[in-house]
Each structure stands twice: as structure tokens, then as C-alpha cells.
Amino acid sequence: MFNEILKKVDWHGNVLSLSTGKIARNADGAVLASMGNTSVLCTVVFDKNTKKDMDFFPLGVYYREMAYAAGKIPGGFIKKEGKFSEYEVLVSRLIDRSIRPLFDSNFRNDTQIICTVMSYDPRYSPDILAIIGSSAALAISGIPIVKPIGAARVGIVNDEFILNPVIHDNTGVNELDLVVAATFDSVTMIEAQACEIDEEKMLAAIEFGYKSLKPVINAIEEIKSSIRKDIFEVTARPHLRYNDEILKHFSSDIKSALLLQTKNERNQQLQLIQQKVIDYFSSKANSEANDGDDILNIEKALDDAKSKIFRDLVLQNKTRIGNRAVDEIRPIICEAGLFNTVHGSALFTRGDTQSLATITLGSSTDEQIVEQLNKCERQNFLLDYIFLPYSVGEISPLRAASRREIGHGWLAKKAIQLVIPSKDVFPYTIRIVSEITQSDGSSSMATVCSASLSLMEAGVPIKTHVAGIAMGLVLGEGNKFEILSDISGCEDHLGDMDFKVASTKNGITALQLDIKVQGINLSMIESTFRQAKIGINHILNVMNNTISCPKSELSTYAPMVQTLEIQKEKIRDVIGLGGKVIKELCKTFDVEIDISENGEVKVWGNVGENVKKAVQSIENIVFVPQIGDIFDGEVVKVIESGAFIKYVTGRDGFVHISEINDTHIKDINAHVKLGDKVKVKIIGIDHKNRVKLTLRTDKEHCKNKNEQYNDITTTTGGVKKKIKIAPKEAAVISNRKYFD
């Protein structure tokens, strides 16, 4: 019944399986890609009617992780998959960026690719299989693509490159997490997060991944040849008939406009030129330029003319938009500490692109809980990228983060992640918000710079600055090409590449490559790295001139934290029955208290004195009471034979009527009342740890019983006091402060 075609490939020690013809047979292309027990179903469907009014390729890519793939039922009130997670959006973009350069430039048909994780094996990541499966599904769909691609992940283990490292063997991903997509002869996409890897080593890693893809691409070609589906025919776009005439009459005007230095000046001039071009063709006899479709074709032809003139400027004169040299960085202005009540802020302006970054420091309860198929983790570093419509002088509704915003924010986060201190060094949850207040290209890399500046201004102990730069490419005939540093929005649109590089002074922390051509070679990547390093060093110098090291103190508006380590068996004492003790502490001192399973206690609050008092109370709770210790207590209950005194939070002791004072007492109520503040001394502890107290706190009263204990001095909340304690029974192991 099924005409299944199955291809298995031995790929560097793993078996890659590609199957088609069994599942989703109504799709134009459907491939089940598997490795180990991870399987991803990739489907392609395209509209057979060409959209003539489209000036872009309407491609939609959707990656979906189904909970059943990992044997789970979705959490939450509604037990089914909801909106796409950030990770699903990021993988969708990864697939899109890998395959988009493959399509025929004249193909303008609605196309949808859906990748569904059907089965999940924790050893093998489904994102690589999704890219490979999408490439294979496209190859058999009948869509005109130039050539298929493969994809691979590269890690580093023991200073050696490893292909597709096992997910839960983190040693292969900690130093480098690189994804490369490529055809037989060129690279189409790169995505990387790295621990300050130098350019030479990064290039070698890209080459290693690129050269490993041959068996994958061969397998896709074999499946394609087995299917032999007719290729959908595309026609040349009708706007091409206007190109020569536009270049003949308007080249000089377009060139002058492109050389203007500011974005607004260029856009205004280009708008005037566009109207002149439309008027020119409208005035001609038998013109169709008043027709809506034909006006759109004229605009497309004008765009082609701008692209050709831009390319000629770069390749022939080494001059670019804004009259810059190919390696020239736009003017940079950095400012730190703009707002008093936020915990940290910085403004980074590069040409007509501007990012305003703000820092918020929070407690461990502010950490983001992220659920994926293979794990549920808490993230204490968050970065949000917000692209505001006024940044490009436009009006649009303010909605939830777009896929583009999620992708740009994630790239900036990966670039900065390396320098973020560990929780042991800096226990705060850190949230960075980058708002793009002005945009003319490279806003994600401006976010990297503003985020780094704001972290130092906030006093977060990062070890060094991270800077980002977007590199462009203009391809000429033969092997001729030029690399552009710090591309503007127009250069991104008219050029062939957007290669984002983030780095410290020591090495690369993140990469992202998008291209509009069929691929680029390793020589172009090497030239990009070399030129990007010069640009990044320049940017780092400007940033260091503004602020070169973290401030010594946090903002007075930031929360304060003090950490204690207590014995595990004392955790229940701090929490209390039904959480009574910890709730009382939080309410009394207006603090948050976080207790981990290993006995680490963090106390958070906005008022330092309250934090210190809460810590002192916790130390009192876990403190092992010893005979002779003196406390300030409160009468909580009075009975005929004596009174119960709360001598520390959560701890009561009993004072017999005979221990109220040295005289005989007939009526205890005449001497102590509920709520009285009294000074008490421990004079006995029975086998059930019940504490016997006295109000007669003279030293001689317990002189002999104290001899077995040592006098030590401890510091609690910055206040020294002498206590009696048996060293082996100490419950407070250590006390760390993160504020003065």
C-alpha cells in the first residue's frame, strides 16, 4: 500500500535515516528524518498560483515539539500544546535561514514548511534533523531549488572538534555550540555560541562541520532522483523591462542619494526619485504605469537599479552608502547611567541605530522557568529585545514579541551569556531590556553593546565588555567580492550577507550568518572575521572609554541579599509547621527567603537593615541552644506555674514561677504579662530538647554548668556578640553578604 523510500546513512558513527512515501502523502514533500530514537516529520506544501504582486518570497516555517514525543503530558491548566515556545520560534528561524537561499529568485508562491518532533531521544537534538528533513522534503516537492543542503552541530571535547555531540554530554557544548548549514560547495547559514574562541579556531570549526555534510547531501540527492517529480516552472518577473531605462535616466540621482550620510536624508531623496520614475513612465504614450500592478513593477525595477549602483560603488570605488569606506564604522556615542531609579542603564548609538538598555536585579524567585522536551530549568539571566515602531518613523500596533524580536534578543543573550557571573559569585536574577529607539541596521549588535555597558553601570561583576558588529558582503563577477563593516539597513537590504559577530577582546562569543545568495565560501568567512576583529576592537575602545569596569556598589534601589548555609536537618525549623515560621519572618521584616535542598538560605529585601535582622533571626532559629545563653524574649503564654517565653523566632522556653525572681511569688500575673519583653537565660535542656529558662540572668546562677562550653565570638548581621556554643553542634555553616 505504501510506496516508502528509505535511505540510511552512516554519518560519523551515527545512523541518519530519511523516509518518504509513508506519512503525510498529500503534502508536496514529506520526509521523516531520524537519528537514534529522535524523529522529526518535515512537510512542504506550496501554492500553485504565483503571487505576482509580491516583492518578497512568502515562506513560513514552523517547528513544533509535541509533548508526547518525550512521553509527557503538557503542564498547566489546559493539557495540550499552546502557543509556540521561544525555543520553537528560534528553531523555526534556524530552519528558515538555512533553506531560504536555496529557492529560485523568481519563485513567489506561498510556501509552508512544518516540522513536528514525533519522537525524542535525549541523546540527539531534533533541530539538526529538522533542517535536514526540510531540505529533503523541498528536494522532492517540485519546488525549484538550486541544490539541497545538509546541517550539522559542532562542539569541542578535549580541544578537538566533535560532530553532533551527545546532548547530555555537556563537555562538548560548553566551549562551542556551532550549527552549520551548507551545500556541497558553499555555506548558507551559521549560528554559534562560544567561549571566547579565536577567529582561526572558529573558522576551523566551520570547515569541520561543512566538510562533514557530503554523505547527508548525497542521501538527499538519491531520494530526489528516486522520486523524479516535475519541477514547477517559474517565469522572469515583469519588472525587468524597466531596468535599463531607469539606469539610463536616473543613475546619477540614485547615486547621489545613496551617498547622503543620514538615513532620513537618503530616504527623503529616494522617495522623490521614486515619484520621478513613476511620473516618467506615466507620461509615456500607451503607458500602463497608472495601473497598480505596474507601479509595483516599477518600484521593483527601481530597487534593482539601487542594488546595481550600490554594488558598482563598492566593487569599483570601495565607497558605500553614506559615503563611507568599506571598513569604516559609523560614529559611536556611549552613555551610562541615564536614570536614577533603575538598577542600571546605558545608551549606545552607532550612526542612526540606537539601543537603550536597562538592568533590573531581582531575587531567585524571579528566575524564568523554561520547559523543554529534555529538561525544565531555571534561568537567572534574561534579555528582552523590543523593536519600537517609532525607531523607523512608523506607526504600528504594539503586540507581543515577534519572531524577529525573539531571535534578535536570543542572539544578544548568547553573546553576553559568557561574561555573566555564576550564581555563587552574584546570586541575583538579571533582566536586561533593550529598546531600539532608532534603527538603521545592526540593532541586535547595538543591543549587545548597550547590554554590556549597562551591566557594568549596574555593578554586575562581568569580567570584560562584549561588542557586536554586523558585517556585509557584495559579490562581483568571478571571485571578486568586498566585505563591509557595520552595515546599515539599506546595505543589508541591497547586499548579499548579514553576518553578525559578537566578541570580547579575547575571542568570539556569538555568530549569526544570513545570506541572500546561494552560499559563501570559507575564504569570504575568513575575510569577514579578519575585518570584524578590527571593527570590534574599535568599538570596545569606545565602550571602555565610557566605563571600563563594573561599579563597586549596586544601585541603592536594587534589592539586597545575604546568604547563609545551614545544616540540612535545620531546614524544617526555618520553614516551620505549614510554613508558619518562614511566613512570619517574611512578613515581619518585609523580605523574601529562598531555601535550597542543600541548606543554602538566601534572604532578599529592599532595606538592608531588615535583611540583617531577618538573617539574625534565622541564625537564632538554627542555633543549637546551650545552657547559659542569654536572649531578649517575649512572653507568649502565662499559666499558674510559670510562663512560656519566645526567646528566638520559632523557639519557646518555659520559665517556672520559681525562676521569675529571687523572692517567693504567689501570683505570677503580678510579675509577668502577655507580651512583656524580658531577658532570659537558658538553665536546662531535657531529653526532648525542651528548654528551661530563668529571668534571673545573673552570671553566678549557671556558673558551674557553663564550664563545659567554649566562649566564641560570632558576627550576626554585622554585630559581634559572645555566645556559648559546643563547636561540633554549630548549625550555621557560613554567612555570605552581597552588600555593605
UniProtKB/Swiss-Prot annotation:
CDD domains: KH-I_PNPase (cd02393), RNase_PH_PNPase_1 (cd11363), RNase_PH_PNPase_2 (cd11364). Its EC number is 2.7.7.8. Keywords: Cytoplasm, Magnesium, Metal-binding, Nucleotidyltransferase, RNA-binding, Transferase. InterPro entries: ExoRNase_PH_dom1 (IPR001247), ExoRNase_PH_dom2 (IPR015847), ExoRNase_PH_dom2_sf (IPR036345), KH_dom (IPR004087), KH_dom_type_1 (IPR004088), KH_dom_type_1_sf (IPR036612), NA-bd_OB-fold (IPR012340), PNPase (IPR012162). The keyword Nucleotidyltransferase applies. The keyword Secreted does not apply. Disulfide bonds: none annotated. It is found in: Cytoplasm. Belongs to the polyribonucleotide nucleotidyltransferase family. HAMAP family: PNPase. This is Polyribonucleotide nucleotidyltransferase. It comes from Orientia tsutsugamushi (strain Boryong).
